[in-house]
Amino acid sequence: HAGAKVAITQDLRWQRCHIKSTALLGNVMHFQQGYREGNAETILFNGDGQITEASSSNVFIVKDGEVLTPPLDNQLLPGITRMLVLACLQKAGIPHRESWFSVDDLNNADEVWLTSSGKEILPVVQVGDKTIADGKVGPVWEQAFTLYSKLKFEL
């Protein structure tokens, strides 16, 4: 996989993002804004500059070999793929934790991924105008994707 380019914008949706409902217009609007600009997805941050999720995905970063994803709360939807990826990381002993991280942390990450049922684990190589690390898919993503692919066939 060559990796994806994504947009980033402040999350202007209501503050009950953990409730999956039919009121997903805000998500669609964020996605369409990024898509019109040639992006695969749009990563969202809150008023404090912390990454929450993407318009239809959960967000992960890797820094110094450790995988981070925002903790579950009312600002993000608890994705099924997110849960499965965390289980794969745990089983394989890959360092990971649920922790808030900033836009700067995202921009300076070694790797960025998005997870969703449709995207599975999508490596991101560019966020806005910022290239992530060397602009190539990283080794921790490769390992996580292999583990996730095996898990899918075990279920």
State each model region's role.
Residues 1-155:
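Helix-start/capping segments and mature chain N-termini
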